[in-house]
């Protein structure tokens, strides 16, 4: 395992794995792991990234110093936007770094 993955703490929901760790910046950074195996079309992968990014932008304070990585579970594709939004906002409120 890499040094970076050892630093990250993990939370999971029904539809996502969320890895997070503090950073030394005055803002948060977001990354995504959406494999081509799970979603073949780049258009759909980008849509997923945009929607999650928007949920995070609304939910988090801009000056929060944290790196967040979202990994999708297969169940993500069977869920609706409201469920995913609720999952993400609840998990982000638990993180509270």
Summary of predicted features, one role per range:
Residues 5-97:
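Positively charged, solvent-exposed patches that mediate nucleic-acid binding
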């Amino acid at each position: 395992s890499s040094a970076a993955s050892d630093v990250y703490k993990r939370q999971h929901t029904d539809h996502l794995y969320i890895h997070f760790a503090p950073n030394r910046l005055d803002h948060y950074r977001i990354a995504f792991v959406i494999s081509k195996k799970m979603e073949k079309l780049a258009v759909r992968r980008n849509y997923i990234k945009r929607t999650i990014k928007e949920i995070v932008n609304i939910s988090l304070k801009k000056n929060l110093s944290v790196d967040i990585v979202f990994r999708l579970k297969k169940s993500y594709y069977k869920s609706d936007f409201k469920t995913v939004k609720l999952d993400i906002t609840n998990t982000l409120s638990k993180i509270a770094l």
